[in-house]
Design a protein with these regions (language model features):
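An interfacial alpha-helical scaffold signature
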Residues: 1-252
């Protein structure tokens, strides 16, 4: 029976006209939650807008700022694939309804392996860091006066451990014979260099800014070497989790 339910659910996830996803206002990404029993890292998906609205209202009542995004059928594959770089492994369908069921992401779609990439190309992703950053910023930004609480310090330490293990994408423009790294100025006047956990996050940035940009891969430990003068640090995925990290430029 469970096997048939799962099969029917996956069929609906592939062929419904649309599904509705709970999105976090804190990260501009799907709201992620860790299942207390299975420890799956899940996103919440519904077949009807009404069911999604009910869950959104319940979360807002707990001071968790969320909204609903409609994902149309033609966007399904791109949406499901976009979950892999975030570290999410499970889709919780219909949470809080009689039809609630968990579907593993790898059961729903088959992702091409790294072996299928063109020669010389590598897949740059940081799912452990990205996922921890999503959890951290969901908690941090939901506060009226955002601060790192005692309960959040362990999560922050885990996040920074993953960050230091990572390899990232940086964007630059060619100026004459040199390279000009991108900088984003903040409202307070500080400037941060954008840093991307994966190519999808870089694409969001590129689509907004336009112009010709090139990319390079850089290990976390080498980032101080490429910091621009005047940069206060990096902003990770500025059109997503937008995590700002203070990093000092390496002295010449």
């Amino acid at each position: 029976m469970d096997k048939e339910r799962k099969k029917a659910t996956m069929e609906k996830l592939r062929n419904s006209e649309a599904v509705y996803v709970i999105m976090s206002n804190c990260t501009r990404m799907p709201y992620v939650v860790c299942d207390s029993e299975t420890y799956d890292d899940e996103v919440l998906v519904y077949y009807t807008e009404e069911d999604a609205k009910k869950t959104a209202e319940e979360l807002r009542a707990e001071n968790i700022p969320v909204q609903i995004a409609q994902v149309d059928k033609k966007q399904f594959l791109a949406f499901y694939n976009s979950l892999f770089p975030t570290g999410v492994n499970c889709i919780k369908v219909g949470k809080g309804t009689p039809d609630e069921i968990a579907i593993q992401l790898t059961e729903l779609i088959i992702r091409p392996s790294d072996d299928t990439l063109p020669e010389g190309k590598v897949r740059i992703e940081n799912p452990e860091f990205h996922l921890t950053a999503l959890y951290f910023m969901q908690e941090f930004r939901r506060q009226a006066n955002p601060q790192v609480t005692e309960e959040m310090k362990e999560m922050q330490e885990e996040m920074m451990t993953h960050y230091k293990e990572g390899r990232y994408i940086v964007a630059y423009q060619e100026e004459g014979e040199g390279k000009e790294m991108m900088l984003l100025k903040q409202k307070d006047g500080q400037a941060f260099q954008p840093l991307f956990t994966d190519f999808l996050e870089f694409q969001k940035f590129q689509q907004f800014h336009g112009g010709k940009m090139k990319t390079a891969a850089v290990e976390a430990g080498k980032i101080p070497d490429i910091m621009m003068p005047g940069a206060a640090g990096v902003t990770v995925n500025p059109f997503g989790v937008n995590l700002q990290l203070k990093i000092e430029r390496k002295k010449a």
